[in-house]
Amino acid sequence: MKVLSLFDGISAARQALKELNIDCQYYASEIDKFAIQVSKANYDDIVHIGDIKNLFKYHDINDSRHSQFYNMKRGEIDLLIGGSPCQDLSIAKKDRKGLQGNRSSLFYEYLRLLNEVRPKFFILENVASMSKASKEIITKELFDIEPIMINSALLTAQNRKRLYWVGKLVNGKYKQVKIEQPKDKEIYLKDIIEEGYVNRVKSYCLDANYFKGGNLKSYFEKGRRQLVFNKPIRLGHFNKGGQGDRVYSIKGKSICLSANSGGKGAKTGLYKIEGVARMLSTIECCRLQGFPDNYVSIVSNTQGYKSLGNSFTVPVIKHILKSISSVL
């Protein structure tokens, strides 16, 4: 299978293909040097072809693998996959500018490449919280193919709702590929927590004095037993209760990993684990996104959290690829 991955990040699609035992020639467009570092550390066979805005406008004539990509004929790519930046589309951004924003407007670069490459299949991923208007524009541009919303919580311990547009080239036109909702594997946060993990950053280990209200204090002191839940369960907060100050139970799902949020625990959420509140480790975040434990260990924790927050959820991509590979 010949694959072109746009906004490739840490090559989640390559990981999904590996787990499905699908051989591939994998071409990746990515500009984040740390994400590329992670990708190269895990897969030395990926051909990195640079900034999406320069594709088919410039390439390294001294790199034979680049030339191999550019010499391919239109229609030779089997799969085009990408998740264009969501920052201007996400409800998390108060002044979101939609598809006119500097980053989310890169969707149109994806569209340009889709029309130039004409792959047999395409997958586009983006946030489910985008406005109705943005969703309608993307759907219209993608040949009226309707997206399916899949929550990663069905396949992992993370609550992460995303839209997926999946199309197949049939007689010169793109048609909808029917994707079924995955079956719930009933994986919860408690199932992926590292054993013996100790957080040495004291500011993440809280006691009752950090809390304004009594709910969390009561929970810690009485040690109440709970059932498991299929969504994030918020126990309480400290300071002003912003996203990075909220504490959740590991008996539910994690909140959605975030690449850019600030605050003490905003990228992963804070969770009550063995009597203290802490953020998740990068290994635990790898598990939430379906990667091997040490997938991002080549970079700092800061860059590891960021790259995982920007990534696809591997089991979801595997689920979609199963539907595609069966008809290739």
Which role fits each region the language model picked out?
Residues M1-V3:
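Extreme N-terminal starter segment of soluble prokaryotic enzymes
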Residues L6-S11:
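Class I SAM-dependent methyltransferase "Motif I" SAM/SAH-binding loop
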Residues Q25-Y27:
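Short beta-strand element of Class I
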Residues D32:
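Conserved SAM/SAH-binding beta-strand->alpha-helix loop
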Residues S39-K40:
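Conserved SAM-binding loop
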Residues D45-I52:
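Conserved SAM-binding strand-loop segment of SAM-dependent methyltransferases
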Residues L55-L79, S84-G262, A277-R278:
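Class I S-adenosyl-L-methionine
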